[in-house]
């Protein structure tokens, strides 16, 4: 099953924590799109990723992708110390809102979403499994 596409841009500090979550989306059959730094990180870790360049890199690819309507979720954690990342993050979040795309800025929330998607897809309820022990 293919659920669609997630667009990911993750602050460096969050990348190790984000990796297993993004891998779960990938294993569920989502297409992964990401900004250049995140793309490089994901590819190094064996996740096929389509690179979209940022507005600060002179590109409107992210907005075109969101506007086309094939992106289901945006995951955007920002490095508050990096001015360009803050601005890009703001632009991405605004574009997501304008195109009615669900946006996550906290990895904890993403984890909850994945639990639900996996339960629907794989038909495995971890809650039931724990109760039967």
Language model region names:
Residues 1-104, 110-113, 122-133:
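ATP-dependent carboxylate/acyl-activation modules
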Residues 117-118:
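Histidine/acidic-residue-rich catalytic or RNA/ligand-binding cores of hydrolases
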């Amino acid at each position: 099953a293919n659920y669609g596409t997630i667009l990911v841009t993750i602050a460096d500090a969050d990348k190790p924590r984000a990796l297993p979550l993004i891998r779960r989306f990938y294993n569920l059959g989502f297409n992964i799109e990401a900004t250049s730094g995140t793309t490089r990180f994901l590819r190094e870790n064996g996740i096929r990723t389509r690179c979209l360049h940022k507005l600060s890199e002179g590109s409107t690819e992210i907005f075109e992708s969101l506007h086309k309507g094939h992106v289901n979720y945006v995951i955007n954690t920002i490095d508050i110390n990096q001015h360009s990342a803050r601005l890009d993050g703001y632009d991405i979040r605004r574009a997501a809102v304008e195109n009615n795309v669900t946006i996550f800025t906290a990895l904890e929330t993403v984890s909850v979403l994945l639990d639900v998607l996996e339960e629907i897809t794989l038909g495995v309820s971890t809650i039931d499994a724990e109760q039967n022990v």
